[in-house]
Amino acid sequence: GSTRIVGTLIESALKQDHEVTSCSVFDVDPTRFNDFDFIVLGSNSWFENKEEGQMNSGFHALKEKLKLDSFKGKKFAIYALGDSNLYHNTFCKAADHLEKLVREFGGDAVVPPLKVDRFYFDEEGNETKIIEWAQGLNQFLKQQQSR
């Protein structure tokens, strides 16, 4: 759905200057995180475990497979989708949960998260926002490589 569309837009922007591999959280092999220099995680904000604003259930399953240092030394960017009209108190809280997950397992979210509001209500405006964020991320990564 919309999370995949956003991921594809980010992937397209990053592919301009970087080798990119993408997969669903349901298909990820936790041992492969060491194969990558930088990782982007994304999720809609869901009603999970009787609470609004949670990350996708696939991340809860992934968390069970991770070791305490699974993300040690890894850098991350995070994006989340939500609806500020219907869920203003929990808008894009999935981003907060993903940042906590990254920190809990030794990683570092190095750029502010992208928060996409009501994706399908303004696809064109949101696509512009997503592409701009991804281009900024691309520039950040290029600067990191040149150091």
Listing of model-derived features with the role each one plays in the protein:
Residues 2-5, 13-17, 21-22, 35-147:
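FMN-binding flavodoxin-like domain, especially the glycine-rich phosphate-binding loop
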Residues 24-34:
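Short acidic low-complexity segments
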